[in-house]
């Protein structure tokens, strides 16, 4: 996710949405940001490979970490802990690019609801009926907005089904303020293996 920032700004500067090979225009910015992550981490760089998302959830929830890079969906993992809802917020990831004071949050999804057109007709209809139920029934809307605390971008969600998630509310404030959201560009990355290799290289760098 962090590697999306230099790609986003390169695409934006060049007026493109994809490319066969990035130029690396903002790799120095990316390095400086990652260095900050390493030096201000809750552990020594040599221990980073042993840390898990559960560690990050616990450290933030207990107030041991000030910043925690994640999305609105992570609220369920950190709520009802030492850090109260009113003390949680969200910040854009700044990398030192001109004009980023108008930057909003990274928004979007790399996962989507899909229906396999090659499935049996009855299975297709059952799937469509279920998806409709999820976003139109009282139980489904209550589950998404209150129990899961997800963003609710559907027309079927009125003020009675606004998310109770304080991170969703914080994200909404950036939209209301007219900040420019940062798109995710995962679909333009070569493969999952490519992302894994980038992660391995970053870990090797962090450990010296």
Each PLM stretch: what is its role?
Residues 1, 55-58, 75-81:
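Pocket-flanking alpha-helical
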Residues 1-22, 65:
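Extracytoplasmic/periplasmic solute-binding protein
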Residues 18-50:
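Glycine-centered hinge/linker elements that transmit conformational signals in sensory
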Residues 40-42, 81-148, 200:
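Extracytoplasmic/periplasmic substrate-recognition and gating elements
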Residues 47-62:
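Short helix-initiation/N-cap motifs at beta->coil->alpha
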Residues 53, 70-75, 109-111:
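Beta->alpha turn/N-cap motifs
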Residues 62-70, 86:
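Alpha-to-beta junction loops
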Residues 107, 150-156, 169-208:
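C-terminal capping/gating helix-and-loop segments adjacent to ligand/active sites or protein-protein/ligand interfaces
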């Amino acid at each position: 996710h962090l590697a999306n920032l230099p790609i986003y700004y390169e695409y934006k500067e060049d007026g493109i949405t994809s490319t066969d090979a990035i130029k690396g225009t903002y790799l120095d910015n990316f390095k400086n940001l990652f260095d900050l992550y390493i030096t201000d981490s809750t552990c020594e760089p040599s221990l980073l490979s042993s840390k898990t998302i559960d560690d990050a959830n616990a450290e933030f929830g207990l107030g041991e970490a000030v910043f925690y890079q994640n999305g609105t969906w992570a609220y369920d993992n950190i709520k009802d802990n030492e850090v109260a809802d009113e003390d949680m917020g969200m910040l854009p990831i700044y990398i030192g690019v001109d004009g980023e004071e108008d930057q909003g949050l990274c928004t979007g999804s790399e996962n989507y609801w899909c229906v396999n057109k090659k499935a049996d007709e009855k299975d297709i209809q059952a799937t469509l009926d279920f998806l409709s139920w999820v976003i139109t029934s009282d139980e489904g809307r209550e589950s998404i907005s209150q129990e899961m605390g997800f963003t609710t971008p559907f027309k079927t969600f009125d003020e009675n089904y606004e998310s109770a998630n304080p991170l969703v509310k914080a994200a909404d404030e950036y939209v209301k303020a007219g900040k420019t959201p940062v798109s995710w560009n995962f679909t333009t990355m070569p493969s999952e293996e490519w992302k894994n290799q980038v992660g391995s290289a970053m870990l090797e760098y962090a450990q010296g």
